[in-house]
């Protein structure tokens, strides 16, 4: 079972629909999203498989969840009581997955150490409230993608605690959960014992990161633009805001329509290279809101209209992430919705979207 690509690449519901359709056609049998808006959008576009909302949903939306057959994560007693009350009011049953906090210290019933008994009791209560159908139970690993004995020990502790909670809750309730899940990308790649009934690969679906490379997966996304104009400047010319870069020779400078409003982190100013047909072109000066400048002095065949790759097959996103001091996932999330999307299958573009028109 796969996790939906509902996280990342900007606030883009249409993209989620496209990729979710592909996952549905490819055999995935459960999707996960972060909000009710995303889940309902999938339903309105023919996605019929079960959908789990991992994030917060206001109690006022419970009737909408039930109407659209959407599963909701329950992370604490207060939310369980709210959802139960609203489900009873509208005369329906809300399918839920109980979240257990085993060491992420974020969402979920706290069950570690002295909190084990109270956590188990709280989960049992949530599973038996009227109007709720506790289909599943899950947790989230904090360091499964990190290497080292300390991290491996912590992940093992989280998993053992999770299974202990499940055993105790099932024993008290006298029935078993249909779906138990905890394996995120790191655990999918490194801890097969944690796969249980369902896995949640996030970044792995995009083919990014070391784990994807180890598994032979290929990146599914590239970000490209074109050169919009080219000018030649004498030595000593200050480029862009603040004049942090000055040409040290006669320089052929190209302008590329990609800036921080599109998702190009300003901290990468004067540090990153964009890829042209003739090789890498250094980005010069501060990145602007809507554009940036690249040095094309030694690339005379690159002209106005020539393609430039921000990241992709020829310009790995992992390098960009390293320079920015972040992870590839944050960079994909940062690509704004004003960047047009093109969907390619079998080498051909089968759909184009300018999301601002949506």
Please name every model-derived segment.
Residues 14-26, 81-92, 102-226, 233-234, ...:
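Active-site loop/helix belt of alpha/beta enzymes
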Residues 42, 137, 227, 305:
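Residue-level signal for inorganic ion chemistry
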Residues 14-28, 41-49, 64-68, 195:
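Glycine-rich loop at the start of a catalytic domain that most often binds anionic cofactors/ligands
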Residues 28-40, 49-61, 69-80:
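Catalytic beta/alpha-barrel core
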Residues 232-358:
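C-terminal accessory subdomain/extension
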Residues 2-9, 13:
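Single conserved hydrophobic/aromatic residue that forms the stacking wall/gate
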Residues 7, 46-52, 93-95, 174-180:
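Short beta-strand/loop segments at the ligand-binding rim of alpha/beta enzyme cores
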